[in-house]
């Protein structure tokens, strides 16, 4: 609390930093659970200890404020730990896309220039094939699920759980400048090589607040609260999993992370943990609804945000028929996790099925704290943008 002391007659200049999201999680919901597949269960308090240990371990490896730490992993509690530990140290977390080709992945690693690279063992061979892209990487830390030392591929490798075990849990996170970079993402599906986009602490906190307002301020069936059980199906390397892991921590939702998955294993997690909130691409929702094992599952308590591509009216109708409360959101790498959202708020859920799907499949309205305009070919934002084509 010493960093909150201030002179009489002055106000505390509250920094919008990820540390403040983290402290809310541990202060209000210390006993809430975070579940990783069938392998690990942590309370928020225990996860906080692991976050402290990760920061201490990275510091011991030489990571300082201003450095970059990269991560290549499936959705996991370890990814979540890096979301907090790395930026709270004053470093930048580069979330790297393992679905890219060798040349593109190598470009992102080379461009990010991480001092330490955290890599799931499934992707270690892929990463090593990027060759010179690793020239500036001082430490390659292997993430693995198995704790059997006999299965380790090399005695000289550094392992994630080992460095956490050796690190103290009393690492102290100081208040830092809210305008320093906290995260580095890379575009996918664009022309040429992936482009890097960085976000500051302030921007990420504001995005989290925008999500909170979008999913908590309206009379809607798409609300996100501490009663929810959240499992993201979008990859965490993409816009921090659309920002929802941060929001889940702030509202105190139970969190479930799938690791490497197929549709059958996802359905098992949905069933066993009674998932009530998720975010996914349209293809994932389609695969879930079409899988034979989903026919016997009750989705009536499930809320799903579909993003990454436009949801079709057919898919939206199929989700509604199964009892899923579905919404769609749009974003872009440069604009953060949420630009607009379309869900059945207010009295919109009382219309016909066709009207409902039409609303869900629309571009929606700009999220709180977001401004949207239509720019013409000269790059000028048009005042009559409601009827003017552009981008």
Residue ranges, per PLM feature:
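Conserved AMP-binding A3 loop
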Residues: 43-45, 182-209
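Conserved AMP-binding/adenylation subdomain of ANL enzymes
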Residues: 205-229, 237-276, 291
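Conserved structural elements of the adenylate-forming
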Residues: 48-53, 164-167, 197-222, 226, ...
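Structural core segment of the AMP-binding/adenylate-forming
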Residues: 60-61, 88-162
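Conserved AMP-binding/adenylate-forming core of the ANL superfamily
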Residues: 10, 32-76, 80-84, 101-106, ...
């Amino acid at each position: 609390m010493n960093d909150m002391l201030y002179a009489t007659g002055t106000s505390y200049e509250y920094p919008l930093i990820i540390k403040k999201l983290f402290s809310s999680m541990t202060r209000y919901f210390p006993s809430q659970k975070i579940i990783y597949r069938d392998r690990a269960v942590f309370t928020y308090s225990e996860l906080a200890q692991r976050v402290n240990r990760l920061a201490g371990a990275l510091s011991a490896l030489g990571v300082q404020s201003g450095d970059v730490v990269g991560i290549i992993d499936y959705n996991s509690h370890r990814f979540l730990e890096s979301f907090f530990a790395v930026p709270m140290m004053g470093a930048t977390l580069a979330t790297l896309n393992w679905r890219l080709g060798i040349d593109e992945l190598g470009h992102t690693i080379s461009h990010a220039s991480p001092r330490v690279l955290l890599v799931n063992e499934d992707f270690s061979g892929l990463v090593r094939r990027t060759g010179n892209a690793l020239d500036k990487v001082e430490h390659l830390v292997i993430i693995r699920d198995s704790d059997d030392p006999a299965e380790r591929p090399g005695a000289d490798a550094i392992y994630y759980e080992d460095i956490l075990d050796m690190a103290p849990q009393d690492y102290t996170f100081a208040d830092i400048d809210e305008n320093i970079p906290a995260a580095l993402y890379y575009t996918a599906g664009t022309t040429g090589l992936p482009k890097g986009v960085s976000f500051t602490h302030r921007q990420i906190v504001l995005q989290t607040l925008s999500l909170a307002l979008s999913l908590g301020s309206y009379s809607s069936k798409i609300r996100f609260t501490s009663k929810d059980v959240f499992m993201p199906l979008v990859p965490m390397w993409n816009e921090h999993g659309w920002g929802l892991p941060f929001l889940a921590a702030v509202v105190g939702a139970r969190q479930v992370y799938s690791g490497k998955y197929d549709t059958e294993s996802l359905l098992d997690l949905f069933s066993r943990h009674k998932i009530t909130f998720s975010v996914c691409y349209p293809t994932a929702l389609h695969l879930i609804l079409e899988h034979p094992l989903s026919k016997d599952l009750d989705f009536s308590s499930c809320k799903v945000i579909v993003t990454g591509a436009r949801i079709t009216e057919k898919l939206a109708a199929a989700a509604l028929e199964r009892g899923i409360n579905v919404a769609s959101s749009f974003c872009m790498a440069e604009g953060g996790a949420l630009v607009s959202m379309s869900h059945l708020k207010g009295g919109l859920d009382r219309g016909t099925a066709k009207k409902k799907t039409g609303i869900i499949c629309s571009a929606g309205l700009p999220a709180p704290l977001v401004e949207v305009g239509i720019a013409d070919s000269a790059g000028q934002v048009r005042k009559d943008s409601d009827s003017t084509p552009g981008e």
